[in-house]
Amino acid sequence: MSYYQRPFSPSAYSLPASLNSSIVMQHGTSLDSTDTYPQHAQSLDGTTSSSIPLYRSSEEEKRVTVIKAPHYPGIGPVDESGIPTAIRTTVDRPKDWYKTMFKQIHMVHKPDDDTDMYNTPYTYNAGLYNPPYSAQSHPAAKTQTYRPLSKSHSDNSPNAFKDASSPVPPPHVPPPVPPLRPRDRSSTEKHDWDPPDRKVDTRKFRSEPRSIFEYEPGKSSILQHERPASLYQSSIDRSLERPMSSASMASDFRKRRKSEPAVGPPRGLGDQSASRTSPGRVDLPGSSTTLTKSFTSSSPSSPSRAKGGDDSKICPSLCSYSGLNGNPSSELDYCSTYRQHLDVPRDSPRAISFKNGWQMARQNAEIWSSTEETVSPKIKSRSCDDLLNDDCDSFPDPKVKSESMGSLLCEEDSKESCPMAWGSPYVPEVRSNGRSRIRHRSARNAPGFLKMYKKMHRINRKDLMNSEVICSVKSRILQYESEQQHKDLLRAWSQCSTEEVPRDMVPTRISEFEKLIQKSKSMPNLGDDMLSPVTLEPPQNGLCPKRRFSIEYLLEEENQSGPPARGRRGCQSNALVPIHIEVTSDEQPRAHVEFSDSDQDGVVSDHSDYIHLEGSSFCSESDFDHFSFTSSESFYGSSHHHHHHHHHHHRHLISSCKGRCPASYTRFTTMLKHERARHENTEEPRRQEMDPGLSKLAFLVSPVPFRRKKNSAPKKQTEKAKCKASVFEALDSALKDICDQIKAEKKRGSLPDNSILHRLISELLPDVPERNSSLRALRRSPLHQPLHPLPPDGAIHCPPYQNDCGRMPRSASFQDVDTANSSCHHQDRGGALQDRESPRSYSSTLTDMGRSAPRERRGTPEKEKLPAKAVYDFKAQTSKELSFKKGDTVYILRKIDQNWYEGEHHGRVGIFPISYVEKLTPPEKAQPARPPPPAQPGEIGEAIAKYNFNADTNVELSLRKGDRVILLKRVDQNWYEGKIPGTNRQGIFPVSYVEVVKKNTKGAEDYPDPPIPHSYSSDRIHSLSSNKPQRPVFTHENIQGGGEPFQALYNYTPRNEDELELRESDVIDVMEKCDDGWFVGTSRRTKFFGTFPGNYVKRL
């Protein structure tokens, strides 16, 4: 048949059997790997020898034709005419070929046929203990045609349609079966058709991935996830566990039983495998054992066979390069002559083809993952072992990934001076006969794996006692600096601790730490056994590890440390209380020192960033994860430093670190400590501070929801201050806080929050009762005469600090309050008041800011107060409750719940039980909306309103421009009292708002300007002056002292025109006590008559 008919028709020539397995097994690499063994053999003696069975007749079984063909690279052995040889197939007609191929593609194997899927029907017999000749499976029929078989049908090529092989393997001439070896006879005495002795775990031989997500080119997920228990067994275990010959033959037989019955006796393939490998191979007895099962051909039913199989398991001799050490196994010595055919250079293309031919596929799955990574020059991330053994001799190859399996395994053999690189997957095995055998160490079954695993995840602390590994924050920073300076480690740390570090270096140092801290992520779990019982007694052996402390500890407990020069011995208490580290002298020890990230406020140093502590840090990531408060289980130990014959005893204390310390927070705290240390070294001796307890009192008194600044807060008490002066200073400090808060709010463009001052007044002053019956009491009094004018804004003013000083004594209220405080309140209140025009606005603004009446009560309308009568006595147990006696009238403000009311009694607001009172029917209004007009006879004239005037109080009269007003009397030089004719509207109004059109000489009277009371300041009046006239106040000129004397306890600023101004220690003659808690009386100091809160005075 011509050469051009070969791609389209069955060929009359067959390829030699040596190409059969390699061609079928390749996936896209047939041209590269088909000449693996034939070409290698040719390179040895220049020719290729092949035994080609032409037919299976009885005559041809005895005839062996040796064809010498020239070598054409890439196509394998050819015949005399240059046409590649072919093998027989079992297809008689083309349609049968397609039918067979379809069946092969869609064949579904049973679970017990897994071995057949992955064990090919024809193999090289290269096992160590197999017979030199094994039975030939699948004899072919004599009527078979020849068809070339170059690729498996899974390849996408133009010739793929003719490359699929039949389910029956190609025929071969079975040579006579020689006698079996003694050790293999027991396993093959059974009939060749019988199944294996026992069911084999086929998971050992699967190579295809279970799913597409587990697939990696060149690797097998099964090899990685279902690795057999041991890839390395002794010869006895291997022979007992799975006899190579019987298992491989049984797989061939089971495959044969599925496809077709055999014709002829089973024969071995040893002679064929030998002839394919070497021309002189057939002449040497027993030589076939070297290459038994070297290759496992793939049938079309299992195309994924090329990804790797159990060949390395079946033939470890081929996977063991004798060239590595030159000493093959003792079991292979008898065939060492032919081991040279397998000594392929590692870097040659044949070696790559050899590996692609699955010789190393099985066991190199783990090797590839480690050895291929050594090609990359990039150094991998460092593990804990690198931190512990950071020595040059531990890493002969700097490019090796330290976490790789090879390096971890060789670490166990480092004491034996392993001569090969760490990345090598082969380690020597010392055998009993003195010979060493190179074998691949199992990933999970290696002798040192368990020990290595424990070492990775559980580090012995004794190995770390003298280690120079520092895992704390500052220590890593200092370690980095010492490495940059190439100095001795301990000496560099000591010097860095005392050097002045420039400010601009601090961010750089912390940035480097942010890189170094990533390496600590690999720190292993140190276990719980070393974190057991905490002892506060310093151990005497000095080997107890010292616990590192968190840098967060700086921000807490900063005021708890005493003077640095006072050294304290080890704590004798078992209480886990954070205490500051202190030393016995101002000079830092310079001996064996290390650094910690604990709080160092009590240590005298140039930089508090660096502290001298001994030991290692055992604060790992997993410790933080395992313990909510890790550092509370720290160790206590003594660090005895010998420096100039002085013993410096450091106290190792508990840290307040409550979790991970991210680098970002460490950056902040480290900078803060750096600045603080620099500031403390240069600041002057601190002035004497007040009692810290009084500062706390000032904080409690101050309603401002913020703390004092740390630099202004007292830190220590130098001497016992006088109690009264300290109270004044504390209150003055609280007022300064309020002033600062108001200024800050004004800078933001908003007026100060009125609730701040209100809260302060509410804390300092008693509640002011609500006015009720006292409104009528003043008007009923015969002493009700207008005499004294008010300031221009219509409000009765007190000294500017009066609203804020509250309960303070007079000395604190007047003399001790600084001018800045007063001016602040002046401006703030003045600015708030000048925004409004009416007198009532001024008064209400002062009321909101400075009145002590509770907000709930002021905001409660009169109609919402329900009177109730107390049926039992109730005594308040807390400050929120309201006391009353049986028969008292209590005004209910609201219902708290089903058991409690909130109400008012005698000006005080509180809660009381519902069952203690009975509701009363609301009484009729005791007074009209405005006071009745004064009984002044006659009229003094008439006037016309020139401007609109809005009444702000009940005594004022609203006017509209053009209204006619009847003038009843002249209250003072600025106010008229009048009424609008035809209505009952009557009140006072400014003189400047009306134009007098008619005036009676009888009632007109000019009033001189009244003298300003001494409590007023001229600048206050001028700063708050307005165009409005002053409002009158009533006084009693003929004070006879007939009232009951009371003394004022607190300052009180009037908010209505009929109220009396009180100053502390004023004496007031009380004329009447109203039932709403207000008193009516005359002040002996000002000679004014009015009402005032009864709870602001006491009986003399």
From Swiss-Prot:
Residues bearing PTM Phosphothreonine: T277, T292
Record's subcellular location: Cytoplasm, Perinuclear region; Apical cell membrane; Cell junction, Focal adhesion; Cell projection, Lamellipodium
Keywords from the named record: Amidation, Cell junction, Cell membrane, Cell projection, Cytoplasm, Membrane, Phosphoprotein, Repeat, SH3 domain, Ubl conjugation
Domain SoHo, residue spans: 66-127
Family matches, as SUPFAM superfamilies: SH3-domain
Pfam families the record matches: SH3_1, SH3_9, Sorb
Entry comment describing in which tissues the protein is expressed: Abundantly expressed in heart. In cardiac muscle cells, located in the Z-disks of sarcomere. Also found, but to a lower extent, in small and large intestine, pancreas, thymus, colon, spleen, prostate, testis, brain, ovary and epithelial cells. In the pancreas, mainly expressed in acinar cells, duct cells and all cell types in islets (at protein level). Tends to be down-regulated in pancreatic adenocarcinomas ans metastases.
An annotated GO BP: cell growth involved in cardiac muscle cell development
PROSITE patterns: SH3, SOHO
Major site of localization recorded for this protein: cytoplasm
Post-translational modification: Ubiquitinated by CBL.
Keyword Magnesium annotated: no
Database matches in InterPro entries: Endophilin_SH3RF (IPR050384), SH3-like_dom_sf (IPR036028), SH3_domain (IPR001452), SoHo_dom (IPR003127), Znf_C2H2_type (IPR013087)
One cellular component term from this protein's GO annotations in UniProt: lamellipodium
Top-level lineage group: Eukaryota
Keyword Cell membrane: yes
Compositional bias of kind Pro residues: 167-180
SH3 domain residues: 863-922, 938-999, 1041-1100
Composition-biased stretches (Low complexity): 287-304
Modified residue annotations for Phosphoserine: 30, 43, 154, 157, 239, 245, 248, 259, 287, 297-299, 301-302, 304, 383, 494, 497, 550, 750, 843, 1017, 1023
Protein purpose: Adapter protein that plays a role in the assembling of signaling complexes, being a link between ABL kinases and actin cytoskeleton. Can form complex with ABL1 and CBL, thus promoting ubiquitination and degradation of ABL1. May play a role in the regulation of pancreatic cell adhesion, possibly by acting on WASF1 phosphorylation, enhancing phosphorylation by ABL1, as well as dephosphorylation by PTPN12. Isoform 6 increases water and sodium absorption in the intestine and gall-bladder.
Free-text comment on this protein's domains from its UniProt entry: The first 2 SH3 domains are required for WASF1-binding. All 3 SH3 domains can bind independently to PTPN12.
Quaternary state and interactors: Interacts with ABL, CBL, DNM1, DNM2, FLOT1, AFDN, PTK2B/PYK2, SAPAP, SPTAN1, SYNJ1, SYNJ2, VCL/vinculin and WASF. Interacts with ABL1/c-Abl, ABL2/v-Abl/Arg, ACTN, CBL and PALLD. Interacts with PTPN12 and WASF1 via its SH3 domains; this interaction may mediate the partial PTPN12 and WASF1 translocation to focal adhesion sites.
Protein name: Sorbin and SH3 domain-containing protein 2
Chain's gene name: SORBS2
